[in-house]
Amino acid sequence: AQRGWTPAFYSIHEELLPIFDSMGWEHFSVGEETVVDLPEFDLVGKAREKIRQPVTRAEREGMHTEWGSWRELSAALTVQIEEISEAWVAEKALPEMGFTLGGIAEARDPEVRLLLAIDADGRVQGVTSWMPSWTDGVQTGWTLDFMRRAADGPNGVMEFLIAKAALRMRDEGIAVMS
């Protein structure tokens, strides 16, 4: 506060909150991380019905996915991603909170992978980006960083993308998705 700055801590684990409380600091939740244990993940049974339905509906309507880095995607796809992102940002009253989720610049990183939902007409309806996570120098997971959906896109496209990402990662031997 010496220069008018207010220090802040982000992504604090719950067990540390009493320390901050004892110093008189306030805290609030910006969001919560969901961690999916991929070896056990599937879309079978009543418990997964709300995840399975958007996947089944999207596939029935001709939706498919494409996975790759920004450089691996065609120019036609990257232009659509940029258009979707620009439209999404323009609709928001506030600027993006870059400290919680990434933007288009991070999606271009060569280590980041994108999963696109592409409809039967070849139009991108949604996109997610995934940053690799590492344990002891070995990639063990992917972390969701960027989510965009076409303004006129079908309901359930994000559920479709996240479920398809989980299944793909599981099949590739990845342990964790968050």
Task: Explain the meaning of each model-derived region.
Residues 1, 5, 9-33, 38-54, ...:
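A conserved beta-strand-loop-helix scaffold within acyl/acetyltransferase catalytic domains
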